From Swiss-Prot:
It holds the Pfam family tRNA-synt_1. It catalyses: tRNA(Leu) + L-leucine + ATP = L-leucyl-tRNA(Leu) + AMP + diphosphate. This is Leucine--tRNA ligase. A motif ('HIGH' region) lies at residues 41-52. Its main location: cytoplasm.
Length: 833
């Protein structure tokens, strides 16, 4: 057989690995550790697509490489299995979401195993397993005990069709829900919040210690959004009311000519005049129908309504009209802003639209034409005139503090985490509300609080979750006869994924979240690979919970993930007609290298696009494995380009990777293997070992594979292959194409053992040195020959070799040699006449 028979070889080795528990996590405490973590998937009904294995293959290469280097390797997989899609499916079909989820997990697991990943399945976790979410609930009770989990009446993004509130991040720019595209309205509801803001400074500062890309760190820094400035208190004219504004530029107070409150601000109704009441009420209603993203869009037309009230500017006593406008959010800052239209473009546009005064307080621009947003010396600012920004801020803050109408303040863009969902398919929040007005956490001895099985998982209609319909579960009575009601909100999908990497370390522990000694052994995670779409929320939430657990003494490290890597996206192919309209792939045929619409015959333009069901361009890994084999898929996805690049899927590239593996198979099975080294491949082999080792370490898998190809080309030029080089090469390719490597290993090693723990090959630095070098031979300054000669020959030896060359002899035949100039390792120049 002169080709790699993947249909026979791959299932054979997958069966071997499963039977022998080949990838069981090592426990030898004398060995170094390596913890390689994938972002665990949500097991959807669609199964894996070819984008999933890209990151999984990367961590698998590292895991196999580290095992061969003698590390204990923890390389686990599990399921982020709570969430809306399963619940939506259950409501649509009447089936139990647990059954749907179990079927999907079985399918995902089958697909993952078919790709030959070296997971330790003894450590599999599932966020919907009560033995797992017992500890999710335990973490919540600890947060509650420390005052970091609390209830609040907050405006939420309510989606009537989904029957739940959703997070800001789940609202699309057009004001509809990410899931389903339903209308989103703002309405106040009782919600559970987690006080992530208490950790804002630590979440910000500790980023500096992490081996993450600067772009991801910057996204987190921007999300946390630290601002230093001042709180300024404004009194409302003719009342005893006042409100506070946070500003990063208190030095521009003399230019503040009006103030703007969020429509939801608590003062609005109290200060609105009777003449303006109807307009204000109407505006508040309109604002409630818009998402925060829509409201704060810089490009949208400015809208607002005057309340009829005035604020008093604390530095000059001037009256400032108080407006409401939807671009101010109640959830951000204090829900109120002081408007300085001369030096803020949004305020300037608002002032122009509603004919409000514009007062310049920083020199350098023409504020009649546009807001001047650069720095300049202060003008029209009384005791700040002539000062620069830093000096003016210091002086105005001192003035405000002395007068009792302001103080220095640090704020964060980060808001507390809205932690409740009005859905069934999530972890029950372990809290009981008693009729005497108190609330208590469910005792640890009664955890897990198990999600009751029910077919009635429609939204309750009251804004509560479907759990409110289950009175047997809902209603409880204390020993003293006091009646209570369980919390009906469930946790968001983020909960189970905020700590799963800890449970992998000790997944069967019934006494605690995980054993302290094991946590010390394995933390932090050495490398975490996943999509950049989780750059902010999941990573921020996991870091928050980890820091909280660190404060409790549960985990030994301040940070969970030492190194983070975001793989790129594998794009599909799209086709467009002359109008630019997309054509689904089932309506496209290929002829003579071009693409045509099967119905109209029109030639189409091909371009990369995100894989989607609607375009029918999703590639299923099952089909690839069936036709080409898992090792081909693995090698192709790693060879496509840099791991962090987004690259289009190519059938031709897949075929190229398959041909390479066939060449590898033929090289080892057809070439004569020698016990003695003839030295012919010394340099090529040692270069390959060094390059592949270094490139795996730096996650440059595409260049590592390119180097393996270089070696195959070099080896194919030789008649025979040295046994140690054959073995070493098989070890080098094993992390990329493990099934092929296992099969070939059996042909060169007599042990019958798996290649998985055979020591990684080393290289001989002395064999990397060039022992030959190319020199040029010039005659009268023109290059006439290029010769390969031994390195470091003397001038005399070089001259002798050059003059003996047949080509050179022909050139100088019949001519007199005047002089020969030899430069070792470079050239020989012959002067003739």
């Amino acid at each position: 057989m002169s080709f790699y028979n993947h249909k026979e070889i791959e299932p054979k080795w997958q069966g071997y690995w499963a039977e022998h528990h080949t990838f069981k996590t090592g426990t030898d405490a004398s060995k170094p550790k390596f913890y390689a973590l994938d972002m665990f998937p949500y097991p959807s009904g669609a199964g894996l697509h070819v984008g999933h294995p890209e990151g999984y293959t990367a961590t698998d290469i590292l895991s196999r490489y580290k095992r061969a280097q003698g590390y204990n390797v923890l390389h686990p997989m599990g399921w982020d299995a709570f969430g809306l899609p399963a619940e939506q499916y259950a409501m649509d079909t009447g089936n139990d979401p647990a059954e749907f989820t179990a079927e999907n997990i079985a399918n995902f697991k089958r697909q993952i195993n078919a790709l030959g990943f070296s997971y330790d399945w003894d450590r599999e976790v599932n966020t919907t397993d009560p033995n797992y979410y017992k500890w999710t609930q335990w973490i919540f009770t600890k947060l509650y005990e420390k005052g970091l989990a609390y209830e609040a009446e907050v405006p939420v993004n309510w989606v009537e069709e989904l029957g739940t509130a959703i997070a800001n991040e789940e609202v699309l720019p057009d004001g509809t829900s990410e899931r389903g595209g339903y209308p989103v309205v703002r309405k106040p509801m009782r919600q559970w919040m987690l006080k992530i803001t208490a950790y804002a400074e630590r979440l910000l500062n500790d980023l500096d210690e992490l081996d993450w890309s600067e772009s991801i760190k910057d996204m987190q820094r921007n999300w946390i959004g630290k601002s230093t400035g001042a709180n300024v208190t404004f009194k409302v004219k003719g009342t005893d009311k006042e409100f506070t504004v946070f500003t990063t530029r208190p030095d521009t107070l003399f230019g503040a000519t009006f103030t703007v409150l969020a429509p939801e601000h608590e003062l609005v109704d109290a200060i609105t005049s009777s003449e303006q009441a109807e307009a204000v009420a109407d505006y508040k209603h309109q604002a409630s129908l818009k998402s925060d993203l829509v409201r704060t869009d810089l490009a949208k037309e400015k809208t607002g309504v005057w309340t009829g009230a005035y604020a008093i500017n604390p530095v000059n006593g001037k009256e400032m009209p108080i407006w409401i406008a939807d671009y101010v959010l109640a959830s951000y800052g204090t829900g109120a802003v002081m408007a300085v239209p001369a030096h803020d473009q949004r305020d300037w546009e608002f002032a122009k639209q509603f004919d409000l005064p514009i007062v310049e307080v920083l020199e350098g621009g023409n504020v009649e034409e546009a807001a001047y947003t650069e720095d300049g010396l202060h003008v029209n600012s009384d005791f700040l005139d002539g000062l620069n920004k830093e000096d003016a801020i210091a002086k105005i803050v001192a003035y405000l503090e002395e007068k009792g109408c302001g103080q220095e303040k640090v704020t964060y863009r980060l808001r507390d985490w809205l932690f409740s969902r009005q859905r069934y398919w999530g972890e029950p929040i372990p809290i009981i509300h008693w009729e005497d007005g108190t609330s208590t956490a469910v005792p640890e001895t009664e955890l897990p609080l198990v999600l009751p099985v029910t077919k009635d998982i429609r939204p309750s209609g009251t804004g509560e979750s479907p759990l409110a319909n289950l009175t047997d579960w809902l209603e409880v009575t204390r020993e003293d006869g006091v009646k209570g009601r369980r919390e009906t909100n469930t946790m968001p999908q983020w909960a189970g994924s905020s700590w799963y990497y800890l449970r992998y370390i000790d997944p069967h522990n019934t006494e605690k979240l995980a054993d302290e000694d094991l946590l010390k052994q394995w933390l932090p995670v050495d490398i975490y690979v996943g999509g950049a779409e989780h750059a902010v929320l999941h990573l921020l939430y996991a870091r928050f919970w980890h820091k909280f657990l660190y404060d409790l003494g549960v985990v030994p490290t301040k940070e969970p993930f030492q190194k983070l890597f975001n793989q790129g996206m594998i794009l599909g192919t799209s086709y467009r007609d002359h109008r630019g309209a997309l054509v689904t792939t089932d309506k496209v045929e290929k002829r003579d290298g071009s693409f045509f619409h099967v119905e109209t015959g029109e030639e189409l333009e091909q371009a990369p696009a995100k894989m989607s069901k609607s375009l029918k361009n999703v590639v299923n890994p099952d089909d690839v494995v069936e036709q080409y084999g898992a090792d081909t898929l693995r090698v192709y996805e790693m060879f496509m380009g840099p791991l962090d690049a987004s690259i289009a899927w190519s059938e031709e590239g897949l075929e190229g990777s398959r041909k390479f593996l066939d060449r590898v198979y033929r090289l080892i099975t057809s070439k004569e293997i020698l016990a003695e080294n003839n030295g012919a491949l010394d340099k090529a082999y040692n270069e390959t070992v060094k390059a592949v080792t270094e490139q795996i370490e730096s996650l440059k898998f595409n260049t590592a594979i390119a180097q393996l190809m270089v070696f195959v080309n070099a080896a194919n030029k030789e008649d025979k292959l040295y046994i140690d080089y054959a073995k070493g090469f098989i070890q080098l390719i094993a992390p990329f194409a493990p099934h092929l490597a296992e099969e070939l290993w059996q042909t060169v090693a007599e042990t019958g053992e798996s290649i998985s723990y055979v020591a990684w090959p080393t290289w001989d630095e002395s064999k990397l040195v060039e022992d030959e070098i190319e020199i040029v031979v010039q005659i009268k300054g023109k290059v006439r020959a290029k010769l390969m000669v031994a390195k470091d020959l003397s001038r005399e030896e070089l001259q002798e070799i050059a003059l003996a060359d047949e080509k050179v002899k022909a050139e100088i035949d019949g001519k007199e040699i005047v002089k020969v100039i030899s430069v070792p390792n470079k050239l020989v120049n012959i002067v003739v006449k």
